[in-house]
């Protein structure tokens, strides 16, 4: 194709409202076009990059044993009421139809995948299993910013795993960490796995995957010698302390969260009465895990990590 026929062109001038390198460079380079705060059109060049990133993610999730599905973004209010998150998730977009029926635009899919899995899974013989999707999510961000890093509409891969016992969940969780690290390595990012809070997802300690960059929004406490790290929001240690794992010195760093994983326990299976039959014929609550990667955010993180005065490198 001739460049003159390419839909979307590079520009000599940076967008005046760009507040981060990825916002400036992706739009100036003809990869995306800003529609409104937190919302972008992906042009042919940008869509090609996004698809490559999502294919890397898809390959690693398939290798982990995930089965790809596609779930709706439009979700019934009653599902969110069942988990008591209708009023507790402050970024949830809420809609009302012409018949006054209320819906949510999904920022996550625990409320959909749990009753879906409950319909098909009955026995320990069908466990463990994992399903994932790559689709569009929505967040009613109070202040969307930083280009494609913090959007109101964005692309995401979310995987959900189902297990008979805690040991099996923890084994899969560990494999998911390794799969995620392979994804980010293939994307060329220096990523640190850090302990973090569970927010509205779980009361347990979770893990974030932080791409280390000075332009990152998150403040981290990390070891200069080993893999130990904590998000400062839940940090039990501070800069200058000794690392509990290796004794090295802890330092502050900035990062962009590009992925997260959660041990959900029985929070959602309790909400939807999701049991399975054990080998000895008893009913037991199923255990769940959740694993997310923001694929459009990942594109932005790569640009933040690989740019200079001349543009994207």
Model regions and ranges:
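TRNA-recognition modules of translation machinery and tRNA-sensing kinases, especially anticodon-binding
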Residues: 1-313
